[in-house]
Amino acid sequence: MEATNGHQNGSFCLSTAKGNNDPLNWGAAAEAMKGSHLDEVKRMVAEYRKPVVRLGGETLTIAQVAAVAGHDHGVAVELSESAREGVKASSEWVMNSMNNGTDSYGVTTGFGATSHRRTKQGGALQKELIRFLNAGIFGNGTESSHTLPHTATRAAMLVRINTLLQGYSGIRFEILEAITKLLNNNVTPCLDLRGTITASGDLVPLSYIAGLLTGRPNSKAVGPSGEVLNAKEAFELASINSEFFELQPKEGLALVNGTAVGSGLASMVLFEANILAVLSEVLSAIFAEVMQGKPEFTDHLTHKLKHHPGQIEAAAIMEHILDGSSYMKAAKKLHEIDPLQKPKQDRYALRTSPQWLGPLIEVIRFSTKSIEREINSVNDNPLIDVSRNKALHGGNFQGTPIGVSMDNTRLALASIGKLMFAQFSELVNDFYNNGLPSNLTASRNPSLDYGFKGAEIAMASYCSELQYLANPVTTHVQSAEQHNQDVNSLGLISSRKTNEAIEILKLMSSTFLIALCQAIDLRHLEENLKNSVKNTVSQVSKRILTTGVNGELHPSRFCEKDLLKVVDREYIFSYIDDPCSATYPLMQKLRQVLVDHALVNAECEKDVNSSIFQKIAIFEEELKNLLPKEVEGARAAYESGKAAIPNKIQECRSYPLYKFVREELGTGLLTGEKVRSPGEEFDKLFTAMCQGKIIDPLMECLGEWNGAPLPIS
C-alpha cells in the first residue's frame, strides 16, 4: 500500500497486494481463518515463547500480548525504528496546526459533550484531561480488589504502544519509548479495575498511565518485587532518563483515547481460551476411552455431511486420539458380549461432543481474529492524516469488537463447561459409567470411601457460576457523558467477566482431568482384579468340577466356560469389596450357571457320583477359601506397582497428559484410606494450568496428527 504518515502501512489484516482486490477486508479476514485451529494454537504457543516482541504497529498477536503480560517470562519489547518517522510526522503536524490556528478536537476544544469550548492553551488542556479522568477508586493498597491485575495493565501498555506506533495519533516517539522501558523493567502503573465503558476508549484506566508519565502525585506503580513506587521512583527503576513529560497538544488524548485495556485483557483471555478449547477436545476423547465408548461417533462421513469446520476438526482430533487406543480395542470386545442387552448408542455428552464443541471453537477462533485486528488498529480520535493535511473526527475508540467478541467467547466457554459437567456426571455415576465404581471410589471398603462426591458438588457450583457469567454484558449499556457517549461497548467489563469465566473453566478442567486419571487407574485395577477372579474361578473349576470322587470325568467339567463368561460379563466393582458374598451378583450368577447345567444333566443328577448339584456347595466353599486371598494379592501387587497386567494408558495417544498429571505433578489414586483429599490434587493441576505447564503434554498428545481426518473406509 502507499506510504502514509511517513511509514509503510501493511497492517495485520489489510491486504498489501498491489491493486488491492479486497477493499472491504473480508478477503483478508477469511484468509486469516485458513488452516486448522490446532495449527493456529501451535503457532500461538511458539510465539508466546519467543524472548522478544518487536512492535511496528501492524503484526502484534494475542500470544505476544499474553507473553509480555506475564512478565515472569522475561519477554523483551522492542520498537521498530522504521515507525519513528511516521510518529514524528503526526506529532509535528499537531504542533504546526496548533500554531497555524487550526481548530481540532481535543487540541483546541473541550472534550465530549463540551467540545464547544475553545482554548489556545494546548498543553494545559492535556494536563486537565488527565486530572479529570483520574476518577478511579482503588481502595487500600496496590493489590486491592479494585486494582486492575498488573498483567492486564502490561497488556494494555503493549497494545497502546502498538497503536500509537502507526503514526496517526500525534504523540512523541519518546513517550512510547518511556512506556516500553516501564514494560522491560517490570514497572507497572496501577490502574483502576472499574470505571471504563470502552467507548471513547478506556479513558479512566489509561489516564493513570498518563498520570505516571506526567508525574502526577496520586500516581502509583508496582516494581518487579511488588514494591509500591511513586512516579519518581518508577522513572528511576525503569531507567527513564528524563524529567516527567509535559504533554504537548493531543498527547494526553492519544494516551487515553483507545481500547487498549479491554483489548489487552481480551488478548490474554483468548490465548487461554484457545488452549482450553483444544484441551476440551482431548478430554472428550479420554472420556470416551475410560467410558468404553463406541468410537464411530468420530467417523468422518458423519461430520463431513454437517459441513461445519469446527465440528469436523473436533471429530478428527478425537478420532486421532482414539485410533489404535487400547481402550477402544478392549471396549469393542465388551460391546460384542450380549449386544442386545446394551444401549445401541452412547449418551449425548460422549456421542455428540464434536457437534457440541465445533461451533464453540469457531466462535473462539473468530473472536481471536477480531481481537487481533483490534490490537493492530488505530483506535483513537481524531486521527491525524498527514498525507491529506487533516484531522479526521470519527469513532474508532468504540470498542464494540471487544464487547461482542468477549460476550461470544464467554458463551462458548460456558458451553464447554456444560459439556464437561455432563461428562463428569456420567463418569462418577455407576448407572452410566460401564462398570466403574460409584463416585470413582477406589478403597477396599466402599462404605468408607465416597471418592469424587464432593468434587461433583463443586463441579455443579462451577458450572452454575459459569452459566451465569454467560449472560451478555453488551446488553447493559447506559448513556454516558451528558448523552454524548450514548452507546458504548462495555468492552473491558466484558473482558473482565470472560477472564472470570476462564478461571472457572480451569477449575472444571483440572477437576475433570484428575477424575479421568482416577478412572484410568480404576480401569487398570479393574483389569487386574478381573484377571485374578478369572484365574481363581478357572482354578477352582478345574480342581472341583473336572472329576468325580473316584477320579472319573464329571459332567460338571463343562461348566467352566460358562462360569468364566459370568466373570467377563459382571462389573468387577459391583462385588469386589466382598467377592464371595451371597448377596452380591458374582456368587449368585456362578451358582445359577451350575444350577442350569444340573437341570440339563437331568437323570444323571439322581446319581451322587454324577450330580452337578452335589458339586455346588463344594465349589462355593473352595471359592470362598481362595478368592478373597487372591483378590487381596492382586490389589496389593497393583498398589506396589507390580500389577500383573500393565496400564493400558501407556499405549494410548492420551498418555502424555496422564503422565504429566501422575508423574510430573505427583498425584495418585485417591482412596478413603488415605489422608490426601481430592482438592489437594485438583490444586496441583490447577496451579500447573495457570502456569501454562499443561500446554506441552497437551500438544504431545496431538503431535502425530496430520491435520486431517482418517480416510472413510
Swiss-Prot record:
Active site residues per record: Y105 (proton donor/acceptor)
Going by the UniProt record, its keywords in alphabetical order are: Cytoplasm, Lyase, Phenylalanine catabolism, Phenylpropanoid metabolism
Q: What is its main location?
A: cytoplasm
**Which reaction is recorded as catalysed by this protein?**
L-phenylalanine = (E)-cinnamate + NH4(+)
Kindly give the InterPro entries that the UniProt entry links to this protein: Aromatic_Lyase, Fumarase/histidase_N, L-Aspartase-like, Phe/His_NH3-lyase_AS, Phe_NH3-lyase, Phe_NH3-lyase_shielding_dom_sf
Top class in the EC scheme: lyase
One GO cellular component, as annotated? cytoplasm
Official protein name in the record: Phenylalanine ammonia-lyase 1
Q: What is the lineage of its organism?
A: Eukaryota, Viridiplantae, Streptophyta, Embryophyta, Tracheophyta
Q: Name the gene that codes for it.
A: PAL1
